[in-house]
Amino acid sequence: MSLIEKLPDLNAVKGGFGERLAAYYSKTVFSDAYVLHDVLIDGKDEHKSQIDLIIIAASGIYVVEVKTFSDAKIYGDGRKRDWQYYLGGHRYDFYNPIMQNKKHVEYLKKMLSDFAKVEFYSVVLMLCDGCKVSNVNRSDRVDTVVCTSLPAMNRAMKMFLEANETKLSPADTRKIYDYIKENQEQGKEARRAHKEDVKAYRQKVQTERENRVCPYCKKPLVLRHGQYGNFYGCSGYPKCRYTEK
C-alpha cells in the first residue's frame, strides 16, 4: 500500500492550520509580505497545481508545501521519486515533495512570466516525528529547503532574505499579489476537476514505478551493477543521472 492510499487528503488534515501558518509568517518573517493560502493555478499543460502557501516579499516569492505526518519518521533523497514513511513498524512510499513543489514553482513562474527579475524559492515543511533528507538541491545554487519545524522554516526564509540582493518594490509585490489572486482558479468545479487530475496523476506515477520509468526524462530505467550492489539507472545516462534501488 502506498502512503497516498493510506492517508486522507492533506488539506482535510490541516484544516485551518495553513491559514494560521500564513498569518504567523506574514508578521514574523516579512513585515511587508503578501500571503496567499491554498491557491489553485492553471499550468497551461492540461494540469493544475494546488499550492499550500505563497509568500510574496521584497526578496522574492516563497512557494511552501506543507506535509503533516504525525508520529512518523521520514527518509528521502531529493533526487529520488519515492520517499519513505515509517509508522508502526511498516514502511510506505510517497511522492517526493521536493519534486512536487518544484512543479508548483514551475507553474507559478509560467503564470508570472510577465514579471521580470523575480526570485523563486521552494520551501517544504515536514511536520513529523523525524525527517532525514539528502541531496535537496541538485546544483550549487540553493533555492530549495526542507524544514521540520516552524522555527527552522523561519531561519531558512531569513537566510534567503539576507542572501538575495535583488529587491522587489512595494508596488511590484502588490502587483504580483493582485495578479495571482485575480487569476487563480476558483469555484467548486475547478476544485473537483483538480482532484480528478491529481487522482489520474497518482495513477500515472504508480504505473511509472511499476514499469521502471525515469521520473525526469521518462526514459526506461535499466538494471546496473555498481560497487555497492545492483541498482536501476536511467537509460539516458550521462545526460540524466537518475537512479533508484
Label every PLM stretch briefly.
Residues R79-R81:
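TOPRIM-like Mg2+-dependent DNA-processing core and adjacent phosphate-binding/basic surface
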Residues M1-Q50, I56-I61, K67-S70, Y75, ...:
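Surface-exposed interaction regions that form or flank ligand-binding interfaces
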